[in-house]
Every structure is written in C-alpha cells, then in structure tokens.
C-alpha cells in the first residue's frame, strides 16, 4: 500500500483502533505535580499511545516499505520513500489520534479527582523532543524531527484545597490514572523557584521566588501566602531525584513578599507582551550565612528543589560547565576518569581547503558597494554583482586530494556539529579574562582534565586547547587559519554514537588563512603566553613568538585576499552558481566596521603587554581604538578588554575611555536588572530587544559586569552577577536550570549530535 491510499482509509482504520483494539493502546499519567493548594498538574506522555495507534493502523504497510528499503539498499539503489512513508503516517496518526485526545483532556467531564470533577481544567502541549524510530535498528530520535513529541500538561483545579497528608487520585475517562500524597515537608512544589545548584554564603542577595502561569488561566493566585512565613530547612536526599524531605527545625525564617504583579510586567516594545504572566513573590534569606544543603519549605505548598549554600557558591556550576568544554574537545580520546561519556579520538585528519573564512560575514551580508552597484569587495558573480552563498558551496569544492595538514586537530566542537571557527575565540577570551582578573580562584587539578598535575592552572590548559588548534595551522610565513569545517553539516542517520560520530566521517578542511583570523590568533596566543610565563616559561615564549609571526603576516596589507577565483562544480545549496566562476576580493584597508580592525588593535595591545616592544604600543596608538571604542563597543566582547584595563602601559586616556564605556554599560545593566521580577540580566524592559535573547545572548551580558567588578571591586557588580547566575540556575519563570547536568530540573533535549546519538537520555 502506498501513501496515496492512506487518506481514504484513515477514518476507517482509526475507527477500528478506537473500537476493537482500544485495550491494546497503553494509557498512563506519568506524574502528578503540586502547583498550589488548589492546582495540580497531571503529566501525560502520549508517545506510546500514538506509536501503538500508528502500528495498529499502518504496521503492515510500514513493514512492507521497510523491507523494500532494505532490499534496495542491498542492491545499491536509492530509496527515499521509506522516510517519507514513516513521516506521513506518523503525522496522520498524530492528528487523528492525539488532537481529539488533547481536546478531551481540556474537558472537566473527562477527569475525576478523588471521584469528583475538577473545578477547572486547562491543557498545555509541552514540546519534549521527537518521536523515536520504528525499532532499535531504525533511524534514531535525532532524525525524526518532523515527529514532534509532546507531554500534555493537564492542569486541574481541585474541588477543595490540599491538606497535609491528603492523597489525591486523578483518573481519566479512558482509564488512565495517577496519584500523589501531599506532604508539607517532602512534596516538591513546582511553583517555588530556587537556584538549584548553590548560593554563595556571602552573597548580598539570596532569594527564592514563588509564581506560576497557566494557559487560559493566567497568574495563579498566591495572595493568601503574602506575609506568611517560609522556612529554610536542612534537606535530606531521597531515593530518586524528586524525592527527599525537609528535616529538623528551620535554620532561617522569613516572610513571603510580593515582588511584582503580572500587571506590572507588561512591555510595549516588539508588539507588546507580558514578561512572565505571573504574580511573582520573593523569599529573601540573604541574612543567612550558614553552609549546607537546604530547601525552602512553605506550609500548605510543600518544598522547593534542594540547593546548597557554600563558601565557593558557584564553584560546582563552574566545574560542570568547564567539564562541558572538555567533553566538546575534538581530536582526542575522551575517557575515564575525566568523563563517563567515553569515545575514541575523532577528526584527526585535516586538509587544506580552498574556501574563504567567515571572519567578516562574507557569506551572508552585502559588504561595501562600488559604483553602479558593482561590489568592490566580497563575493561577486561574473557580472560583478555582489552575491551571497552557502559556505558549504565553497567547502564542497575543496578537493579530497588537497594537501594534508599533519597534526592539525583539536579545539572544541561547535554546538551541534564538528566545526571549529573564529567565534570560538570568545570562549578563549572568557577563560583568559577570568584567569587574569581572579588568579587566586584557579589552580592546577581543580577540573580533572588530562593536563591536571602539570603545574599549570587547569583553566589555562583548557584555554590552550582552544588556541592550539589554530597554532597547528600556522604556516611558515606566520599566517593562521580560523575555520575548520566539513562539506556539510554531519548526518545522524545511524542509531549509535559510534556510527554517527566516528564512522564514515566527512573530510575536514581548513579555510584559507586571512588577516583577521591571524590577528585574532596573535591576540589569543600572546595573551595566553603571558599568563603562562610563571608556570612554563618555555611554552610562554613559544606562544608569544608564534603570535609575533602571525601579527607580522597579518599587518602586511599585501596579504589581503585579492583576485581569488573559484570555479563552482558542486553547488547543491546554490544550484544557480553551478558551472560558473565566482570572484572574491578583500579590501586591504581595515576600517572600524571590520572585525579585522578590532582584532589588529587588541592583538597589538596584548603583544605589547607580553613583550614590552614599543612598536606594538605604536600600532595600538595608530589604530585609534582608544577613541573609537565607545562607538563600536557593542561588537566587542568585554572579556577582551580585561588585560587592557588591568595592565599598565597603554595611554591613560585610552584606558579611561574604555573603562568609562564599560562602567556605563554595567551600571545600566545593574539598574535594569531590578526591573525584572526574577532579576534577569538584560536591557531595561522598556528598551525591548527581547527577540535578541536567543543563541546565548542573555548569558553574555554578565561579561560586562565581570569586567566592571574586576576593575572597580564595587560589590554591586558582584551582586548583579550572582542574581544573573541564580536566574540561569533555576530562579526563572520555567523553574529549570538552563545548563545540562546542574540542578534537579534541567534540559536533556538539545541540539547536540553526541547526545542525540549515544542512546543515553541524560546528555
């Protein structure tokens, strides 16, 4: 049976399932959660039901299609139909089975709570990931992104308020059931939001929050708790992540206070919105200075997720995030005792590619225009018209017979794939800035990485891993590449990490070196070399000398990329370019709008600090960066400024200009933070820019505060950073941490091929 027959049979087949085979479809409630004395949430995962219904209707057809697929594969033929067959049939079943089910969930008559109908009900489909494949040998979860898997969050208003010790049984009309027993000391309340990792014992502000928004309902009403007591109690861990209890007498008692009504959180910018939809209450325990593992406990609501209060505060989160960098390492074996997520070395073979690096957004933006729209630089077609194209078009035209680059491996894999690129220098700037500003916080052996024990602080070893991949690309003339990429994003059509990650790897190619990438390398290598001097003088000299050579090559305007021509043979992403020859030119003059201008100036400053060679100071002064910084600061990582503000030697007026600009930005963030109910670190609510919060931008604001604190030691910046960390670690509307592996509730589904392919639910 082929797909054109499906539509006519859907209703008949579905009637057969719902009448004659209903008992074969599994139905359950995965969890019942407390939100308030009056509201609970029944969590339904309909995945098994949808797949069972799909099998009942289309099992024979899918088996036939799969056999045809396997036969064609064995015969060396292409067969695209099987994937479309599964996609179509699954989507049909999601609509035919799940949509009516979802509608039923939204009816009070469908549910019974302790035998009575709930007072109200509302449902939210919470996206989880994708539906699994047909069987263990089939296409894995990461290749079924068309099949959205959801959890139906069924919010039920109880007929009467919960009492301590009361059991609640939830039943659906189709037989699904779940239950809980509410206990003040041990039942988690999902409306209490805390930093689920650790608060610093000396933090000026330590707070938890209370609030919840429900679809179709709005802000849950916690007014009855305003002015009531909350208790900070020792926490005793249970057998599971969601088990445990508050024990003993309170170590701190405080009052629940209203922080912001939802009506005070409307913003008019960007179409208008409400920031949380919640009436947010605050529980301040800043005066508590003890250490240990605790939870917030509120009579009538339950307890929060556990957290620690420790002297080092955010040290545990720092360790976990740094371990994430280690796990992202490319070109090396990952093994115990450094990680439980083991794998052999990967991507150890790199060849010289014939493609332009992405150092100036060449592939996506129109750069400068010449007369009559004839582009003076960038990519141009045969007529001279400026064009944009996919980077994979040029990378795919790199020859597999290109020269090998022995030993070129390393760096960190990008977010979901395996490239290493110039943007990764941002990580290096952050690591070096932290090590420069707060050296007492970092030592050898604290991160449990292979380099631990070599006498060098681990944070510098990790930074060196990011620098070394580019150092290995350095040519004899000093030029350095800044991008290593494959001809396309890696596939994930295998069902295991070994196959998708290690077997049949596409060839890695390194981009043509350019001036901007070489300047960026010179900045990083000279900075790293200087910080390594107390621990390894020889390595220090090696990095600094390598930086000198890269800088000297990049400074020569004759090394600008000019007159490059690229015959396009493979052009799957840009079919109109196939068979043509495109041209590329780079302007040798660097202006304020060029990333190379910034990279050159900061490289000169760092080389001056590392060598005390006055020629680099002259280059810094000639760049005019001290005067232009405030105009282009929005495009410069504040971390890059750390050495310039903490080391002597630059013109005082330049340093003062940069310092003033950064302090003004930091003060603005401190001022706007208190305008948010959960003390999020962002621009002021009336400024908007909420659309730009994706891709980690909301995290990056903390860099400004870190530099301001390092330079001034004003505790207000430290407090603002701690508030921001609390937000990321669970003090937010969703009540989840934003970092895998930290806290009780954290992301497990993310765009990360390793995790999607290794068969382990926890990333």
PLM features per residue range, with description:
Residues 25-152, 197-198, 204-299, 328-425, ...:
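Aromatic (Trp/Tyr) and acidic
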Residues 157-165, 286-291:
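Surface-exposed, short loops/turns at beta-strand junctions within beta-sandwich domains
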Residues 160-191:
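Acidic, Ser/Thr/Gly/Pro-rich low-complexity segments and short DxT(G/T)-type signature motifs
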Residues 175-180, 301-310:
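Short Trp-Ser/Thr-centered turn/loop motifs at beta-strand boundaries
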Residues 448-455, 459:
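Acidic, glycine-anchored loop motifs typical of Ca2+
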Residues 457-483:
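Carboxylate/His-rich catalytic cores and anion/metal-binding grooves
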Residues 624-630:
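Solenoid-like repeat scaffolds
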